[in-house]
From Swiss-Prot:
Species assigned in the record: Swinepox virus (strain Kasza) (SWPV)
Name of the gene this protein is made from: OPG054
Any single Gene Ontology cellular-component annotation: host cell endoplasmic reticulum
Keyword Lipid biosynthesis carried by entry: no
Protein name: Serine/threonine-protein kinase 2
Enzyme class per UniProt: transferase
Organism lineage string: Viruses, Varidnaviria, Bamfordvirae, Nucleocytoviricota, Pokkesviricetes
GO MF assignments: ATP binding; protein serine kinase activity; protein serine/threonine kinase activity
């Protein structure tokens, strides 16, 4: 595939609704696809109910007392969790994707039910970071997460079928434990969520999952972790009539964690003096990335639209990162780097993103992103207030907020501050640890 370094990116159109296309390295993509059984089917629901009628609370107790426990069925936040093999482990589900970890890969499935978009209209998550990476000339390009491959217009019905199979299994297990009548089609969502959340960390319940998941689900896709997120996604009333038919599969490198997961203790272990110094590090790297993007010809319209700590991923950094800006040289000797991720709603230069047209009704620039970013930083890390100079500098981005100008941290009005506003901030003494190679 031709490198995406031109403002006039051209793509072959997909005329047939069933045609598929792979962007990027098809070796990565073919490997991931080879690990998925996208044609898997299960026996009818009535047979599943008949199977569970053979069990009762006493037989469940016997299984819990005697059977093997698979630690990968604990929740990932549980210290007892351990991935035993290279299965696909569910790590998140949001409004715009279902994400799994598999070995050194992150695999994201995105349903595209909106018929007004062609498959090519949904490629921003691959094309925009690739375009930026190919055009940025310095180490700032290392602060972008680029997908290794993206498959367009693939049939994803298997994932919804898998979710339903696991949901029904969990329902039948819970109903048996609670001495309830077995029923998978008429049940209380509130009852299921409450009961599952109460039981999911119990070792006896995890033993039941260890026993039944291989028998009932028979899949290398483990969705037990954060299953409630998947439940809320698929059962949401606004998706009641979705077909869950086709969408995209995106393959990324695996990060250590998202930036919002770092605690005070973790920050110190990473070599920072405090959590506030870590936040300064994150803020400075992302600010420099934006500034360097805005230096590119025709790129002064760049918008990410969802700039927040959990969309900034932390990767290992094997060598110092050096970024030059005017008379300043910023040097980062830290063992990590902060990389911008999730470009699904982004726009830059002449690479059109139809989704952003429906998302934003008025003109915005970088300030829209940073206004939202500062709000989310202050909410995630209230410790910032302990550093008055840093806190005051960030407050400048949100000091004029009212109900008429800002809703849920997002600007409702067009405020087109020049990028020099951000440039002046990063030259302040609060970032002296990294200016002109002074970091150690």
């Amino acid at each position: 595939m031709k490198e995406i370094n031109s403002l006039e990116c051209q793509w072959e159109s997909i005329d047939d609704n069933n045609d598929t296309t792979i962007l990027g390295d098809d070796i990565y993509f073919d490997y991931i696809i080879s690990q998925l059984d996208i044609h898997q089917n299960w026996s009818p629901d009535i047979r599943l109910i008949r199977y569970f009628r053979k069990f009762n609370k006493e037989s469940f107790d016997k299984i819990s007392d005697t059977e093997y426990i698979n630690p990968s069925f604990f929740q990932q936040r549980d210290k007892r969790f351990y991935p035993l093999n290279d299965d696909f482990y569910h790590i998140s589900t949001g409004g715009y994707g279902i994400v799994f970890k598999m070995d050194k890969y992150v695999v994201k499935f995105v349903y595209e039910p909106n018929k007004q978009y062609s498959p090519i209209d949904t490629t921003a998550e691959y094309t925009i970071p690739k375009f930026l990476y190919n055009n940025l000339k310095g180490d700032e390009k290392k602060l972008i997460v680029c997908a290794w491959a993206m498959g367009l217009n693939y049939k994803l019905t298997f994932l919804h079928r898998l979710y339903k199979r696991v949901l029904y299994m969990l329902l039948l297990i819970i109903q048996t434990i609670d001495n309830q009548r077995l029923n998978i089609h008429h049940f209380s969502h509130k009852y299921f969520l409450k009961s599952f959340n109460e039981k999911k960390s119990d070792i006896k319940f995890v033993k039941l999952l260890s026993y039944f998941y291989p028998i009932v689900v028979q899949s290398n896709i483990n969705v037990i972790n954060y299953f409630t997120h998947m439940f809320h996604f698929f059962e949401h009333e606004k998706r009641a009539n979705y077909l869950y038919d086709r969408g995209n599969i995106i393959i990324f490198p695996l990060a250590r964690f998202s930036s919002d997961k770092v605690t005070e203790q973790m920050a110190i272990e990473l070599g920072f003096k405090s959590i506030v110094q870590y936040v300064k590090f994150i803020f400075l790297q992302i600010s420099l990335l934006y500034i360097k993007i805005y230096e590119l010809p025709c790129c002064d319209n760049f918008l990410h639209v969802d700039l927040k700590p959990d969309n900034i991923l932390i990767f290992n950094s094997d060598c110092p990162i050096t970024i030059k800006f005017k008379k300043y040289t910023y040097v980062f000797n830290e063992p990590i780097k902060a990389c911008l991720n999730d470009f699904d709603f982004s726009q830059v230069a002449n690479i059109l993103n139809k989704k952003i047209k429906n998302s934003l009704k008025i003109e915005h620039n970088w300030y829209y992103d940073f206004h939202f970013f500062i709000h989310t930083l202050l909410r995630t890390y209230p410790e910032i207030e302990s550093d008055k100079e840093f806190s005051d500098s960030l407050e400048d981005f949100i000091m004029c907020c009212t109900k008429n100008t800002c809703e849920k941290f997002r600007l409702k009005v067009s405020i087109l501050h020049p990028i020099s506003f951000l440039e002046n901030l990063i030259t302040k003494n609060i970032f002296s640890n990294w200016i002109n190679g002074e970091s150690c």
